[in-house]
Amino acid sequence: MSKPFYVRFEVPPELAEKAYQALEIARKTGKIKKGTNETTKCVERGLAKLVLIAEDVDPPEIVAHLPLLCEEKKIPYVYVPSKKRLGEAAGIEVAAASACIIDPGEAKNLVEEIVKAVNELKTKAAQ
């Protein structure tokens, strides 16, 4: 299956897995927001440290604005394959199209590692 139009770079499965883990840790020891509305507000206000966007969102227009907004606000973002798994990592029983980490808590080093890897991926994708 091809990637939706809003996916600007390929994220390796192991990096997506780290993003899920970081969200779970931040949920327990820091602060997160879940859902596209809350995530959008946090990005607009410059509060988000890392944004997670699911690749299997239907219709894709729900999250299509997030990569552009993150670029504009210089906030790192990463794609994850499953909205269901994203919801679980965020601690809710339903799927989440997107989520963001505001305070990474004990996931600080993991978030920094993810941001570094994402920046390298974006650089490669731009070439």
From Swiss-Prot:
It is found in: Cytoplasm. SUPFAM superfamilies: L30e-like (SSF55315). The keyword Ribosomal protein applies. InterPro entries: eL8/uL1-like, Ribosomal_eL30-like_sf, Ribosomal_eL8-like_CS, Ribosomal_eL8/eL30/eS12/Gad45, Ribosomal_eL8/Nhp2, Ribosomal_eL8_arc. GO terms for molecular function: ribonuclease P activity; rRNA binding; structural constituent of ribosome. GO terms for biological process: ribosome biogenesis; translation; tRNA 5'-leader removal. Pfam families: Ribosomal_L7Ae. Gene3D superfamilies: 3.30.1330.30. One of its GO terms (cellular component) is ribonucleoprotein complex. The keyword Ribosomal protein applies. Keywords: Cytoplasm, Ribonucleoprotein, Ribosomal protein, RNA-binding, rRNA-binding, tRNA processing. Belongs to the eukaryotic ribosomal protein eL8 family. NCBIfam families: eL8_ribo. Multifunctional RNA-binding protein that recognizes the K-turn motif in ribosomal RNA, the RNA component of RNase P, box H/ACA, box C/D and box C'/D' sRNAs. HAMAP family: Ribosomal_eL8. Part of the 50S ribosomal subunit. Probably part of the RNase P complex. This is Large ribosomal subunit protein eL8. The lineage of its organism: Archaea, Thermoproteota, Thermoprotei, Desulfurococcales, Pyrodictiaceae.
